[in-house]
Design a protein with these regions (language model features):
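Acidic/histidine-rich catalytic cores of soluble enzymes
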Residues: 36, 133-268, 325, 329-330
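Boundary/entry segment of secreted carbohydrate-active catalytic domains
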Residues: 1-20
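Glycine-rich, proline-tolerant flexible connector loops at the mouths of alpha/beta enzymes
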Residues: 37-65, 114-121
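A short, acidic, flexible beta-alpha connecting loop/helix-capping segment that sits on the rim
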Residues: 13-16, 43, 292-309
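Hydrophobic faces of well-ordered beta-strands that scaffold small-molecule active sites
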Residues: 4-10, 36-38, 72-77, 110-112, ...
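C-terminal helical cap(s) of enzyme catalytic domains, especially alpha/beta-barrels
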Residues: 302-330
Length: 331
């Protein structure tokens, strides 16, 4: 079995408002999960239920994680930062707040998804400069926080691991690297929720070539952590008439919000080649760092799926992925 430690995003343990962050943390720990990505909105909800500041909430959550032997992996997601039209001074002030919370949580990473708004700068120098300023802010106090940059499949300026790696290399900061997610690789190059087949044209070739280039070109030390999730095949192909569709929203974003089960949960329609991606990203490059489950399953919204149930699903999913990786490696 792979030596990687398993983490999970707090939102992937439940999206029901009545399931509070401390409950999720205990459930993850009891299931044998080693780490957790704290989603800011979950922490904010917890602070309100406790009637305390978000800073005090972060300190309490850190203490709870120590008591339950759970490591905070990251604070996420600091969205739509690089190249945004709002003044950089305001964005850096917000970034400073997020970094303060990350340090109180003792989170080694602040996760930043690639910007996905349309009203943003396309200028490469601006994008790189913005990310350098944030990285420098993150390293200006102790403990240093590292920036985990995640290419979204619907990102405006960056939507592939290759684009993200190029940005990482140009930002050129020790505390700036990659957060890689199988959902984004799978939906950018292989899956298509608007196609009756569920697949893009030349899907297998595009994905295979991408993974080969990844193994050849991606430096292992710039992979900060890897997120795993699958995607559900749409029974009725996506269109603007689909009940989940929103005007102006990318179809991959819609897909992400509603239909991202844990890897290999075929009973929920999971069908992406997650094992192929995970094998390249983890085994073939010798990555031994954190693996985190980041799923968005609409079945978790109404409260019928408890954090305990979700945590068990996550552990079983990771077990299945490891078994499949080993099985394919022997072929």
């Amino acid at each position: 079995m792979a030596p990687n430690k398993l983490a999970i995003a707090s939102v992937s343990l439940s999206q029901y408002p009545g399931h509070i962050l401390d409950h999720k943390i205990r459930a993850a720990s009891q299931a044998g999960i080693a780490g957790i990505e704290i989603v800011y909105s979950d922490l904010l909800t917890y602070s309100k239920t406790q009637n305390i500041s978000i800073q005090a909430a972060a300190q309490k959550i850190h203490t709870l994680c120590l008591e339950t032997n759970l490591q905070v992996l990251s604070l996420a997601p600091f969205e739509n930062y690089e190249g945004a039209t709002t003044p950089l001074k305001e964005r850096l002030a917000l970034g400073q707040h997020w970094l303060e919370i990350a340090r109180l949580l003792h989170a080694p990473y602040l996760q930043i998804p690639s910007i996905y708004t349309t009203d943003c700068s396309r200028d490469e120098k601006t994008i790189i400069s913005d990310l350098q300023r944030l990285s420098d802010l993150a390293s200006s106090a102790k403990p240093v926080v590292s920036i985990a940059y995640e290419p979204l499949s619907w990102g405006t300026n960056c939507s592939t691991w290759e684009g993200a790696l190029s940005i990482v290399q140009r930002v050129e900061r020790a505390n700036f690297g990659l957060c890689l997610d199988t959902f984004h690789e799978g939906t950018k190059l292989w899956g298509d929720n608007a196609s009756p087949s569920g697949m893009q044209m030349d899907a297998e070739v595009k994905l295979r070539d991408s993974l080969r280039r990844f193994v050849r070109d991606c430096p292992r030390d710039k992979i900060f952590y890897v997120q795993l999730s699958d995607a559900e095949r749409f029974e009725t192909p996506y269109s603007l008439a689909h009940p989940w569709a929103l005007p102006g929203e990318a179809k991959e974003f819609t897909w992400s919000k509603h239909a991202r089960p844990f890897p290999l949960e075929v009973e929920f329609g999971a069908y992406l080649p997650v094992v192929d991606i995970a094998r390249a990203w983890i085994v073939d490059v010798g990555f031994e760092g954190w693996i985190s489950m980041e799923t968005f399953d609409r079945r978790m919204v109404n409260g019928q799926v408890t954090p305990e149930m979700a945590a068990k699903r996550a552990v079983e999913s990771w077990r299945k992925v490891q078994v499949e990786i080993e099985s394919k490696s022997r072929l």
